[in-house]
From Swiss-Prot:
HAMAP family: YciB
Membrane topology: Multi-pass membrane protein
Cited Pfam families: IspA
Protein name: Inner membrane-spanning protein YciB
Keywords of the record: Cell inner membrane, Cell membrane, Membrane, Transmembrane, Transmembrane helix
Transmembrane spans: 3-23, 24-44, 49-69, 81-101, 119-139, 149-169
Role description: Plays a role in cell envelope biogenesis, maintenance of cell envelope integrity and membrane homeostasis.
GO CC, any one term: plasma membrane
Chief location category: membrane
Family: Belongs to the YciB family.
This protein's encoding gene: yciB
Keyword hit for Cell membrane: yes
Length: 176
């Protein structure tokens, strides 16, 4: 259910794009992300840093798209977001000694610290590659194809990455 909740703004963006085009879809994505943050704040009293970053990036890049009437800004938004996540994961670990992946998943999984470090780097690389893939699609395909990639391509890549990661992690999990 959380996975669908996380996809809420993207799904609404996709639907609005198909009906009204990129600029209305951008406005819908901004409002949907604001609503998502408001709901999380109301329901849980605490909003994850990643969601705040997502909100900031959609407001800045979506706002630039609407104000300047240039769709390139919203198309660059996923790349900027993915690269911020990648940099954040690596900076937290290597500059501040905090493994954010371990902090997020440590209660669910018991893993040796070197495995957590590999997982952290894997996620950072995954986000970096997603950012590059997004730029490739933006510059080599139509706007409609990019929107399809944004929903189906990146979501599919995420699912495949999580499955592969889960298979890799099974050798480190202890029978409980």
């Amino acid at each position: 259910m959380k996975f669908l909740f996380d996809l809420f703004p993207i799904i609404l963006f996709f639907a609005a794009f198909k009906v009204w085009g990129i600029f209305t879809a951008t406005a819908v994505a901004i409002v949907a992300t604001l609503a998502q943050v408001a709901w999380v704040a109301f329901r849980h009293r605490k909003v994850d840093t990643m969601l705040w970053v997502s909100l900031g990036v959609i407001v800045v890049f979506g706002g630039a798209t609407l104000v300047l009437h240039d769709e390139k800004f919203i198309q660059w938004k996923p790349t900027v977001l993915y690269w911020l996540f990648a940099i954040g994961l690596l900076a937290a670990r290597y500059a501040f000694g905090n493994n954010l992946i371990e902090k997020m998943m440590g209660k669910q999984l018991t893993l040796p610290h070197p495995v957590w470090d590999k997982l952290n780097v894997a996620w950072a690389l995954f986000f970096a590659v997603l950012g590059v893939a997004n730029l490739y699609v933006v510059h080599n395909y139509t706007e409609s194809q990019w929107v399809n990639f944004k929903l189906f391509g990146t979501t599919g890549a995420m699912v495949v990455f999580i499955i592969l990661q889960s298979l890799w992690l099974t050798k480190y999990l202890k029978d409980e």
